[in-house]
């Protein structure tokens, strides 16, 4: 009988990536097949996020529901991973004895051994250690599930912003070797992936080891990924302004594969609040980065994160944030009311902004951003946008859907063979959360590169010297 696995994922794109790797890993080692129905699963995994308020209580509420399933099926294995697992550790077991496995973001690769331990001994196991890059060395080969894919290039963060739990839950910055990243991207390209999104908590701090003992910077990695045939779009997330260096900006001048869209969190427009957050930059320095970016790529569109109601935020501080939003003219944003995270320096600050004031400021900020989003969308009316077709539309199975380079969802009439390919679409209608258009050019009418597998590249470029020894000649 086929064994079933169900994973519930909360949080960031890194968590989504980790969950996909868990499913692939347990599929390859134990033969588990994915199920959307928790009630029919043999293993239930909860991949958690601790960024938002009451994250722990949300976890224990879910575990309470899963406990009922375990009462019906005592052989059911329940595991908790992610950032809440890193924070809570053994405490999860004390509050929820139904949990068999507690693992951190850096120990998910040990899940097969943990499951074997539980199945063999019927005793629980907790492993929330930080074994650095070992995680990536033990994960299965990448498997494409469409024309877009996430590729993790680094883990952790060294910035220790006062509001953030990431350094405590995912550890400090560790970069994957550049060759490992490039080989994974090439494998995905060979499976039909056309767009990659490079992931990291602080992705522009990437410093990956090279095969010859050197160090590959993030700017160099971007150019190397862009050189892989079949990869026509590159995104990345998330960045920190203090490491958004000139060499990264220069990539926007000469690498068209890098999309004209950037998520660069600023959090606040007030220098006083930025100092309290330990962001290590000012609003003026942030604006200087944006000026350089727009000089390198005039059509670039920007998004940001904003924390509303940080301890000590005055009306004047908030107005400085609103001024920054207007001056930069952000396309989109992810904005949240501040909530204290246990164990962070900000948790010891006096949270003196009332909830009503926080909600009012959030409404004002989001309303302004929504106006700017609509303005950007209206400017696209009548323009031709290149779309990567991701599949059928959620609005109608008779239509296709895909994203522009600036991350707008576009619905249009097309044929099934377009899925996984690029098409040029004229925008004919602007809706609240999407666009509509008409196909004016198919991929066959474009001059795009054909992907090659890593094996075919090696075979094509392999030479033999006078002794018959194979050498690689790029």
UniProtKB/Swiss-Prot annotation:
[4Fe-4S] cluster 2 binds at residues 157, 161, 164. It is an enzyme of class 2 (transferase). Pfam families: Radical_SAM, TRAM, UPF0004. GO terms for molecular function: 4 iron, 4 sulfur cluster binding; metal ion binding; N6-isopentenyladenosine methylthiotransferase activity. Its EC number is 2.8.4.3. InterPro entries: Elp3/MiaA/NifB-like_rSAM (IPR006638), Methylthiotransferase (IPR005839), Methylthiotransferase_CS (IPR020612), Methylthiotransferase_N (IPR013848), Methylthiotransferase_N_sf (IPR038135), MiaB_methiolase (IPR006463), rSAM (IPR007197), rSAM_horseshoe (IPR023404). GO terms for cellular component: cytosol. It catalyses: N(6)-dimethylallyladenosine(37) in tRNA + (sulfur carrier)-SH + AH2 + 2 S-adenosyl-L-methionine = 2-methylsulfanyl-N(6)-dimethylallyladenosine(37) in tRNA + (sulfur carrier)-H + 5'-deoxyadenosine + L-methionine + A + S-adenosyl-L-homocysteine + 2 H(+). Its cofactor is [4Fe-4S] cluster. It comes from the Bacteria. Belongs to the methylthiotransferase family. MiaB subfamily. This is tRNA-2-methylthio-N(6)-dimethylallyladenosine synthase. It comes from Serratia proteamaculans (strain 568). The gene is miaB.
């Amino acid at each position: 009988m086929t064994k079933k696995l169900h994973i519930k994922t909360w949080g960031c794109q890194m968590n989504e990536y980790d969950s996909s790797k868990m499913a692939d890993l347990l599929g390859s080692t134990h033969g588990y097949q994915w199920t959307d129905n928790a009630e029919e699963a043999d293993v239930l995994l909860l991949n958690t996020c601790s960024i938002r308020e009451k994250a722990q209580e949300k976890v224990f509420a879910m575990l309470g529901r899963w406990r009922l399933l375990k009462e019906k099926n005592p052989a059911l294995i329940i595991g908790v991973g992610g950032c809440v697992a890193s924070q809570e550790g053994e405490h999860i077991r004390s509050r929820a004895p139904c949990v068999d496995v507690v693992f951190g973001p850096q120990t998910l690769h040990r899940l097969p051994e943990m499951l074997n331990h539980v199945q063999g001994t019927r005793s629980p196991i907790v492993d929330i250690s930080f074994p650095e890059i070992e995680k990536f060395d033990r994960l299965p080969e990448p498997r494409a599930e469409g024309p877009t894919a996430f590729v993790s290039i680094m883990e952790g963060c060294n910035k220790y912003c006062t509001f953030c739990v990431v350094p405590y839950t995912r550890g400090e910055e560790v970069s994957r070797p550049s060759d490992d990243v490039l080989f994974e991207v090439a494998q995905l390209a060979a499976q039909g992936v056309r767009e990659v999104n490079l992931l990291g908590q602080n992705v522009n701090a990437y410093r990956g080891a090279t095969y010859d003992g050197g160090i590959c910077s993030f700017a160099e990695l971007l150019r190397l990924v862009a050189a892989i045939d079949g990869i026509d779009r590159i995104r990345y997330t998330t960045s920190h302004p203090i490491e958004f260096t000139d060499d990264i900006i220069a990539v926007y001048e000469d690498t068209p594969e890098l999309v004209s869209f950037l998520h660069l969190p600023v959090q606040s427009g007030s220098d006083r609040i930025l100092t309290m957050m330990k962001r290590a930059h000012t609003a003026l320095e942030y604006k200087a980065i944006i000026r350089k970016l727009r000089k390198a790529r005039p059509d670039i569109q920007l998004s940001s994160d904003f924390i509303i109601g940080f301890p000590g935020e005055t009306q004047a501080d908030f107005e400085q944030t609103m001024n920054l939003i207007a001056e930069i003219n952000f396309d989109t944003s992810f904005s949240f009311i501040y909530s204290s995270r246990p164990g962070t320096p900000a948790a010891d600050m006096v949270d003196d902004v009332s909830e009503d004031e926080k909600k009012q400021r959030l409404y004002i900020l989001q309303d302004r951003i929504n106006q700017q989003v609509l303005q950007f969308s209206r400017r696209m009316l009548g323009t031709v946008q290149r779309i990567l077709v991701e599949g059928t539309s959620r609005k109608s199975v008779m239509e296709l859907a895909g994203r522009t380079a600036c991350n707008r969802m576009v619905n249009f009439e097309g044929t099934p063979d377009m899925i996984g390919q690029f098409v040029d679409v004229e925008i004919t209608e602007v809706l609240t959360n999407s666009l509509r258009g008409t196909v004016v050019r198919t991929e066959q009418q474009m001059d795009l590169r054909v992907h090659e597998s890593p094996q075919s590249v090696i075979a094509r470029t392999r030479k033999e010297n006078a002794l018959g020894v194979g050498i690689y000649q790029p």
